[in-house]
A protein has these predicted regions:
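Cytochrome P450
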Residues: 1-382
C-alpha cells in the first residue's frame, strides 16, 4: 500500500475506506520505495511516539509522501530545526521554547485573538454574503497571531502564506519556498539582534545562533498558522454539514474527528529492532502514523465515527502528538480555535454553506488536510 489516498467527497471527514480495517501495524511502501510500516491504533502510535528507540531525525526516516525537508533528503536537519532532532539536542531547544509558550502567556493573548476575530467578522458583515471563510477569516486569524507572537511583520503575510502552502502542497516548489522563507527569516533575525522587540524571536537572540533561530522561526511560523487555519475552516465545514451547533467542548472532538495531519505524519525511524503490536520493526525501518484512523480507534472511543461535541474523553486524541515532540503551541491552537468558532457562530447564528457540500474543494493531496475555500452565507436584514 502507498499514500496518498483520497478521501470520499461524499464523506469528506472520514478516513479513506482503504485505511479502515487494517492491522495495528500494516506494511507501507514509502515515497522512495522503502518498505516501512503504518501504525493504525492508539496503542501502537503511543509506543512509536513515546519509545526512545524510535527517532525523529530526518536523515534516518523515509517519508510516506514526497515532502521537502530542510537540508535535503537523507541529511541531518540544520541547526534549530528541532522537530527533526532527538534528545539531548531536542531537549535543549524544547526547554528554551517551553519558556516562551507558557500558559500565562497564552492566556494573555486571548483578548488579542478575540479582537482579531471581531475585526474580521466586522469586515465580513460589511462585505455581506457570500464570502470565502478561508480567506476572510480562517487564514488571517492564526496568521496575525503568530506574526505578533514571533515579531514577523504581517504586511508580509502574502509572501509567507504562499511559501508555507508550497511546503505542504505536492506540485509546488517546496525547495524554493524553503529557501525564500529561510532568507526572509534570517534577515529578520539579524534585525532583531540590533533592534529587539517584545516578541519571541527577540527573546531568544541571546540563546541561539542566527541559523538556529532562523529554523526555529521557520517551524513556528509555518506550523503556527497552516495547521490552525485549516482546522478552523474544516471544523466550520464539519459543523455546518452535520447540522451541529458549536459548544465549548467541541474543539477537542473536532480535533479528534477531523485529524488534519492525514498523509502518514508524524513518523519515526527504528534505532534498533523493536516489537510493536506483535510485529517486529527492524532497525532502520520507518513507521508512519495514520492519525485519521488512530483518532477513531474503537478500543479507545465509543462510537468513534460519530461527531459528538460533548464527548467526555475526546482529549485522548493524538492531534498534537505524544511524547517529547508533543506540539509546543497546542494551547495557543486550542485558544484560537475556541475563540474563532465561538465568535463566528455568535455573530452569524444563521451561518450556512453557500454551495452544496459536495462542491467544497478539498485538499486531498496536501500533507495538511482542509478545504481550499469555504463559501458561506447568512441571513441579512434586507
Amino acid at each position: 500500500m502507498r499514500l496518498p489516498i483520497e478521501r470520499n467527497q461524499e464523506c469528506p471527514f472520514d478516513p479513506p475506506a482503504r485505511l479502515r480495517g487494517l492491522p495495528p501495524m500494516a506494511r507501507l511502501e514509502m515515497a522512495d520505495g522503502h518498505l516501512g510500516w503504518l501504525a493504525t491504533t492508539m496503542a501502537a502510535a503511543r509506543t512509536v511516539l513515546g519509545d526512545p528507540r524510535f527517532s525523529a531525525r530526518q536523515e534516518l526516516k523515509h517519508t510516506a509522501v514526497h515532502v521537502v525537508r530542510p537540508g535535503g533528503p537523507a541529511r541531518p536537519a540544520p541547526p534549530g530545526f528541532f522537530a527533526a532532532t532527538d534528545p539531548p539536542e531536542h531537549t535543549r531547544y524544547r526547554r528554551l521554547l517551553t519558556g516562551q509558550f507558557t500558559v500565562r502567556r497564552m492566556r494573555l493573548l486571548e483578548p488579542r485573538i478575540e479582537q482579531i476575530a471581531a475585526d474580521h467578522l466586522d469586515a465580513m458583515a460589511k462585505a455581506g454574503p457570500p464570502v470565502d471563510l478561508v480567506t476572510a477569516y480562517a487564514l488571517p486569524i492564526p496568521s496575525l497571531v503568530i506574526c505578533e507572537l514571533l515579531g514577523v511583520p504581517y504586511t508580509d503575510h502574502d509572501f509567507f502564506q504562499d511559501r508555507s502552502a508550497a511546503l505542504v502542497t505536492p506540485g509546488r516548489d517546496g525547495a524554493q519556498a524553503t529557501a525564500d522563507l529561510t532568507a526572509y527569516l534570517g534577515e529578520l533575525v539579524r534585525r532583531k539582534r540590533v533592534e529587539p522587540g517584545d516578541d519571541l524571536i527577540s527573546g531568544l537572540t541571546g540563546e541561539l545562533t542566527d541559523e538556529e533561530l532562523t529554523y526555529v522561526a521557520l517551524i513556528l511560523l509555518v506550523a503556527g498558522h497552516e495547521t490552525t487555519a485549516n482546522m478552523l475552516a474544516l471544523g466550520v465545514f464539519a459543523l455546518l454539514k452535520e447540522g451541529l451547533p458549536f459548544e465549548e467542548g467541541a474543539v477537542e472532538e473536532l480535533l479528534r474527528w477531523l485529524s488534519i495531519l492525514h498523509q502518514g505524519a508524524p513518523s519515526r525511524a527504528a534505532l534498533e529492532d523493536v516489537e510493536v503490536a506483535g510485529e517486529l520493526v527492524r532497525k532502520g525501518e520507518t513507521v508512519a502514523l495514520s492519525l485519521p484512523v488512530i483518532n477513531r480507534d474503537s478500543a479507545v472511543f465509543e462510537d468513534p465515527d460519530a461527531l459528538r461535541p460533548d464527548r467526555p474523553d475526546a482529549r485522548r486524541h493524538l492531534a498534537f502528538g505524544h511524547g517529547v515532540h508533543q506540539c509546543l503551541g497546542q494551547q495557543l491552537a486550542r485558544n484560537e480555535l475556541r475563540i474563532g468558532y465561538r465568535a463566528l457562530f455568535e455573530r452569524f447564528p444563521g451561518l450556512r454553506l453557500a454551495v452544496p457540500a459536495t462542491e467544497v474543494p478539498l485538499k486531498h493531496d496536501a500533507s495538511v488536510y482542509g478545504v481550499r475555500c469555504l463559501p458561506v452565507t447568512w441571513p441579512t436584514a434586507d
